[in-house]
Amino acid sequence: MNIYFLGIGGTLMGSLAQLAKAQGHIVTGSDNRLYPPMSDQLAAAEIEVFEGFDPAQLDPAPDLVVVGNAGLPRGNEAVEYVLNSGLLYTSGAEWLGRFVLPGRWVLAVAGTHGKTTTASMLTWILECAGLAPGYLIGGVPKDLSRSSRLGSDPFFVVEADEYDTSYFDRRSKFMHYRPRTLIINNLEYDHADIFPDLGAIQTQFHHLLRSVPGEGLVITPAQDDHVSEVLHQGCWTPVSRFGTGPVRKSVGADTGELWWARTTAANCAEFDVVFGHEVQGRVSWNLIGEHNVSNALAAIVAARSKGSARVPSA
């Protein structure tokens, strides 16, 4: 298939283009501004990229046009050409959900903060466990060298963004991913350009919760009232909670599994991973800060979930 990516320079779109190339498709694309690291990644993948949005780049017509979100509204000359010519088109998030994720055990990392870090940690844990997960991350992790990979195992880690999908699909991107393991790291008011208030964001997260199967797993902080309010709207999936001790449960929290980190260094450079009252392992690393401990704990819980039961203890 010949696939053309409009807005290929964005982190999501450039990462998707690399996945499409790895699947064996003929991939080209265009954007107004292209710069590292995505420009370097696309060049390494030998993907041809055009400057600007000249409709002539779409002649002869590709089999499919994947339309990005950033800077591609109605009125863009390439977008108007796609519509007027009746070309087959879709959004980036929908393409991922339809052509990459089916048949995979999707581990999605959502929330206001820490998505890229947590998704990178989770992917690296699976990698170190001898697996070869697919992934799509909103950055270029140091240990993984690129932002996306098809992988050869059933597991696929995706950074799940709540921002809207495209000019023609105002649902949050993560609604296309259908995760079986879902991390919600935290939840605050964000994206004031599309969400009027926190409640509107919580509604999107509740829609996401409704898409997780009963045999999956939802992983949430034990001390985030905004996340607990979303769960309280209805959740049909087992829940594991995590936190840094001492842990108090949030408003409306149920009695799901509880994982917590017991720091053994003042700067959080070392901590024990505790499930119930039993220490599962100790983490010693070069990172500092309670926020990084929280991210790591969420990743560890996800890696130990039912879908990735081959992963060893922390």
Listing of model-derived features with the role each one plays in the protein:
Residues 26-31, 134-136, 241:
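Short beta-strand "acidic-cap" motif of Rossmann-like dinucleotide-binding folds
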Residues 12, 36, 98, 142-143, ...:
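Flexible, glycine-rich phosphate/dinucleotide-binding loops
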Residues 19-22, 57-58, 73-222, 226-238, ...:
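Phosphate-binding loop of NTP-binding sites
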Residues 1-95, 217, 225, 256, ...:
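N-terminal leader/targeting and accessory segments in enzymes
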Residues 6, 62, 68-69, 189, ...:
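Adenine nucleotide phosphate-binding catalytic loops in nucleotide-utilizing enzymes
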Residues 10-12, 113-117, 293:
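Residue-level detector of alpha-helix initiation sites
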Residues 12-14, 154, 173, 180, ...:
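Short, flexible segments with low predicted structural confidence
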Residues 40-43, 61-64, 101-105, 146-148, ...:
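Short secondary-structure transition/capping segments
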